[in-house]
A protein has these predicted regions:
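P-loop NTP-binding core
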Residues: 1-367
Length: 367
């Protein structure tokens, strides 16, 4: 008598775990005993599915702490090393990141970093240039005028709601020196932090007399008693009263322009505003620096945009361009600039070269 054919028992997903599982060696299952997972049991009635409550209790979700993890960028989930950026050939090398010294200007240079178009790298440019100059031995102050406080975060300064800073200086006539804090990014770098409280300042300033001069008075009083070679005013992506205060307080404008389509969008309106401010409120104001950001050498568009910008601003545009860089994007999530996060990266070296050009131009123009 022939034995009946052996049929393979298949278990559908709704009936629990199958008895025989082929495991892909590249992925693998967690090393958990079968008993823990309550595999299906044979009975006269067929296969008894696992209890959902038992299965859930046996395989709890692993809680991942919030925030970035450095290992996430050092090695991906398949163990492949990250793609390294090629450092540009230029004025600086990685070994000279913190040792290069730059000439100090005879008078404080106050830059407003502005562009009406958002996403062009205003805050990134502000914090990295400030850090580059400070790491080169110069004294630098950064004033955060953006209610989002991204510049404050990128320089490693905590700023929960209620933290005294720019809002108190503008709205309560507080002394700027009372609220300036040291940044851990460089020994010579100080920050006037911004919080979400600053969001209401645009409306509150409307009813104040001489509202456009609030920051100028506070900054001049600070510089009389405290030394600073460079001051950077990081503005929100709009031409409101906060940006107007910065334009009145500054003597130079630094415009970051991304090397992408619509790159000059917003610059035309900014130039009109500059002319109005120069004519009525601040005759010392001038556009001195244009910095090309997010440059992708793989595309023709980036080169075309760079040529177009240099044609419009031949004297102001720096030779150095800031490349599109993963390291530059990652650094703020660690409360760092790219110069301390990855000092040998192309982005860090490019910002150092830009800072060197800015410092040398300042001395040459005075001479």
């Amino acid at each position: 008598m022939l034995a009946p054919p052996v049929t393979e028992n298949r278990v559908t997903p709704t009936l629990g775990w199958p008895r025989n599982v082929e495991v892909d060696p590249r992925i693998g299952w967690p090393t958990v005993p079968r008993e823990t997972l309550d595999w299906p049991k044979a009975s006269s009635a067929g296969v008894v599915p696992a209890s959902p409550s038992d299965t859930a209790a046996a395989a709890p979700m692993i809680e991942i702490p919030p925030g970035p993890r450095r290992a996430r960028f050092d090695e991906d989930e398949f163990g492949s090393p990250p793609v390294e950026e090629d450092p540009p050939t230029g004025l600086l090398t990685a070994e000279r990141v913190t040792t290069a010294s730059l000439p100090a200007p005879p008078l404080p240079r106050i830059f407003v970093v502005a562009n009406q178009k958002g996403g062009v790298g205003k805050t990134t440019t502000s914090v990295n240039l400030a850090a580059a100059l400070a790491l080169s031995g110069l004294s630098v102050l950064l004033v955060d005028l953006d209610p989002q406080g991204n510049a404050t975060t990128a320089l490693g300064v905590d700023h929960p709601p209620g933290t005294p800073g720019t809002y108190e200086v503008l709205m309560a006539n507080a002394a700027l020196s009372d609220h300036v804090v040291d940044s851990p990014e460089a020994p010579n770098l100080k920050v006037l932090p911004a919080t979400i409280d600053l969001a209401g300042a645009e409306i509150e300033l409307v009813s104040i007399v001489a509202r456009e001069n609030r920051l100028k008075r506070a900054l001049r009083a600070y510089l009389q008693d405290h030394h600073a070679d460079y001051v950077f005013l990081d503005c929100p992506p709009s031409l409101g009263l906060l940006t107007l205060n910065a334009l009145v307080a500054a003597n130079e404008i630094l415009v970051p322009i991304q090397c992408e389509y619509y790159a000059l969008e917003g610059v035309t309106q900014l130039m009109r505003t500059i002319d109005l401010v120069k004519g009525e409120l601040n005759d010392e104001l001038r556009l001195s620096i244009v910095l090309l950001t997010m440059f992708d050498a793989r595309t023709k568009l980036a080169a075309q945009v760079a040529d177009e910008v240099r044609r419009h601003f031949p004297a102001a545009t720096l030779p150095t361009v800031i490349p599109r860089s993963v390291r530059i994007s990652e650094a703020p999530s660690y409360g760092q600039t790219v110069l301390t996060y990855q000092p040998s990266s192309a982005g860090a070296i490019s910002y150092l070269e830009a800072a060197q050009e800015i410092a040398r131009r300042g001395v040459e123009e005075i001479a």
